[in-house]
Amino acid sequence: MKKVKLIYNPMAGNRNFRYYLDQFIEKFQGVGYEVSVFRSAQEGDLDLGVEQVINQDYDLLVVAGGDGSVNEVINAMMKHDIDLPLGIIPAGTANDFAVHLGMPADIETCFDVILEGEVKQVDLGEVNGRYFINVCAGGLLANVSHEIDLEFKNTLGKLGYYLKGIEQLPKFKPIPVEIKTKEQVIEEDIYLFLILNGKSAGGFKKIGKKASITDGQLDLIAVKAQPLHEIALLFIKILQGEHLADENIIYLKDSCFEINCLDQSYSSSSSDVDGEKGPQLPLQIFLHSQALKVVSNISNV
């Protein structure tokens, strides 16, 4: 009999996934799986669920939660050298990576996709020793998901992120950074940067429209310091996916980046990694090609 481990975060999103547990078990038992479930009891304990897979002959690992939960599970998989296909159920507030894989918003439909979808080898990013599947970001908006109240986030969803970001804009100071690739060094005052593995971040589905999780490269997008009215125009371009050629955008592709802050007063600036608080600058970012197996709902990821 095949074995599947389901790991879920009961606090993710609207907290409704628990109502689908029996349907999940019934669906997978119906096609010959022995089902084991791990329910997160506190922040940071999803690693314990992944540990339960070690040397237990599992065939499939499934995580239900948002980008942060997926990130935690993936880091645990890499830590314990677990080479199993990962199915993702988008049960969080932000589900950018699941969207990239074509996973449906309907939870029960996801069960079918995980059972019938294609297993793909995809790239992983690493920043200062921590893995990320979708994005590493810094600057404006990077701390939004860490500062926003959980109830506020769960009630308003992505709108909560945007409202908090707008609140930050008038008082945010540009960050002077040095961006290094294998071939060039750029010094610029910027409002924010994104290192993308997938195409979307923060619900913006077209922000990394040229990115691919199978191309062996990461996409860097940085927004240069500029007047607020120009940011408003750039925001419209981002929504339309027409921002990469804008003069106020730095756009690079490479397999590694180094980002340093040129002003010591910003030395405590932290990053965001898949929606969770990340390391402080400076950042060393690398790509690991085809490091993870995921279940996808689309052929070309």
PLM features: what roles do these ranges have?
Residues 1-64, 184, 301:
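ATP/NTP phosphate-donor binding region
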Residues 2-4, 84, 255:
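Nucleotide donor/acceptor-binding cores
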Residues 22, 26, 51, 75-79, ...:
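Short, well-ordered alpha-helices that flank and scaffold nucleotide-derived cofactor binding pockets
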Residues 31, 40, 79-191, 195:
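Catalytic core of DAGKc-family lipid kinases
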Residues 68-84:
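Short Gly/Thr/Asp-enriched flexible loops that form oxyanion-binding sites at enzyme active sites
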Residues 137, 141, 194-207, 277:
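Glycine-rich phosphate/pyrophosphate-binding beta-alpha loops
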Residues 152-160, 209-229:
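Gly/Ser/Thr-rich active-site loops/lids in small-molecule metabolic enzymes
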Residues 181, 187, 212, 222-301:
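ATP/nucleoside-binding phosphotransfer catalytic cores, i.e., glycine-rich phosphate-binding loops
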